[in-house]
Regions:
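Active-site glycine/GP-rich loop and adjacent strand/helix microenvironment
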Residues: 1-23, 27-30, 34-35, 157-261
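Conserved ATP-dependent adenylate/AMP-binding module captured primarily in the ANL superfamily
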Residues: 114-130, 166-178
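Acidic/glycine-enriched edge-of-secondary-structure segments
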Residues: 97-112, 148-149, 155-157, 172-180
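Short glycine-enriched loops at secondary-structure junctions
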Residues: 87, 110, 136-139, 187-188
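Nucleotide 5′-phosphate-binding alpha/beta core
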Residues: 1-92, 99-112, 119
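Hydrophobic alpha-helical segments that mediate membrane insertion or helix-helix packing
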Residues: 93-97, 151, 259
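Conserved AMP-binding loop of ANL adenylate-forming enzymes
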Residues: 121-156
Length: 261
């Protein structure tokens, strides 16, 4: 079995030849301590945290950052100037009337996201593929745009479908554009397959929403191939983890995110 694209991406980004748990732990601790030191020097939002941790186990002594923190004090968390911000995603938390949380991305953050999308999508999208991108398109550096950019860099062709097409419009795209791959939310994909047929679609990545096992099995039965689930959130730069060709779990972008499961 070949190495997953995400593992290869991490090796390339960190200039290492192989991934071991010890290597990942060192990368994570070194990067975390660099951020803590920089934050202590600039007296920002996290100024009261220790300047250095001796091990990743020390993370359990640190307080959580809450949605309220992001909404009320997100600007103070920046480690760059406002002029370096390329994209801001705002979200109004349900049940509240106050300020929504805001997550900021620099050009470098967006580039890392594109590289992750290239690694994940590159497991099943090939040069020349035609891919329906049924995700929100909200302007430069939005989710749909970043996915489309990653597909172009692979050498494939993104169809900027968006997430608000009618079944009639989707059927027209399937018949006229003949996509072989699909990126979108699981329930929307299942609805399209049931209402419009699968057309020429052979493979699909699902993201943006939880996917119950019953929905996953129903989609896989129609397509006749395993799904490629992706996990991400705004706080982790939109991209977090995706399965590889073994389909036995997900690979995290562990050089950028520390996860607790």
């Amino acid at each position: 079995m070949k190495r997953s694209n995400i593992d290869a991406m991490i090796c390339r980004q960190e200039k290492i030849t192989d991934i071991t748990r010890e290597t990942i732990n060192k990368i994570q601790l070194d990067k975390l301590n660099a951020v803590l030191k920089r934050e202590k020097e600039r007296q920002g939002f996290y100024r009261d945290l220790p300047e250095r941790l001796e091990s990743l186990d020390d993370l359990k002594t640190l307080p959580f950052t809450t949605e309220s923190d992001l909404a009320q004090k997100g600007g103070r968390m920046l480690l760059c100037s406002q002029g370096e911000i390329q994209r801001i995603i705002s979200e109004q938390t349900s049940g509240t009337t106050g300020a929504g949380k805001r997550v900021f991305y620099t050009e470098g953050d967006c580039e890392h996201t594109i590289e992750l999308f290239m690694a994940g999508l590159g497991e099943f999208i090939y040069p020349g593929s035609r891919t329906m991108v049924a995700m929100p398109f909200s302007g430069p550096s939005g989710l749909g745009e970043l996915i489309a950019d990653a597909i172009r860099r692979i050498g494939a062709h993104p169809l900027l479908t968006g997430n608000n097409k009618t079944y009639g419009e989707l059927k027209t795209i399937l018949e006229e554009e003949r996509p072989d791959t699909y990126v979108g939310m699981p329930t929307a994909l299942l609805s399209m397959l049931r209402m419009c047929g699968k057309g020429s679609i052979k493979r699909a990545l699902i993201s943006g929403d939880a996917c119950p096992e019953t929905v996953m099995k129903a989609i896989e039965k129609i397509l006749g191939t395993p799904l490629w689930p992706h996990y991400g959130s705004r706080e982790m730069g939109l991209g977090g983890a995706i399965c590889c060709q073994a389909h036995e779990g997900m690979h995290m972008r562990e050089n950028h995110c520390i996860t607790e499961i």
